[in-house]
């Protein structure tokens, strides 16, 4: 059994590197999620252990929140940080209030994985679901 991506929350353990190392035998991509208030520099010591960063754009735990405004700037700073560290290979994933507009902005900052949900693709009429996904994809291309 193999997962494609497994994400560890930076704030969930004092042993981030150990948690990431634990995943090596499973052959999955290792992502590190960081909360809106976590400084980008905190992840520097584990860059060699990750394939991607999941930047949370809202505080975790509740669907339907509005984006934390500073996270848009943080996404841009993260892109620059990864360039400075010569780690442009690290994938940027964004999660939380990812509207079409936010998605387009975040794409310009290097995001390539978008966790879409309540703010962009969920709808009460499932017959519109495919249309919502197409609209979102077009917005972030």
Which role fits each region the language model picked out?
Residues 1-91:
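Conserved anion-binding
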Residues 2, 110, 117:
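Active-site-proximal glycine-rich helix-loop-beta segment
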Residues 17, 68, 104, 126-130:
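Conserved strand-to-helix beginnings and helix N-cap segments that scaffold or border functional pockets
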Residues 38-50, 96-114:
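Catalytic cores of alpha/beta
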Residues 53, 78, 95, 106, ...:
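Conserved, mostly hydrophobic/aromatic
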Residues 60-61, 97-101, 120-121:
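Short Gly/Pro-enriched loop/turn and capping motifs at secondary-structure junctions
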Residues 107, 121-141:
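C-terminal helical cap(s) of enzyme catalytic domains, especially alpha/beta-barrels
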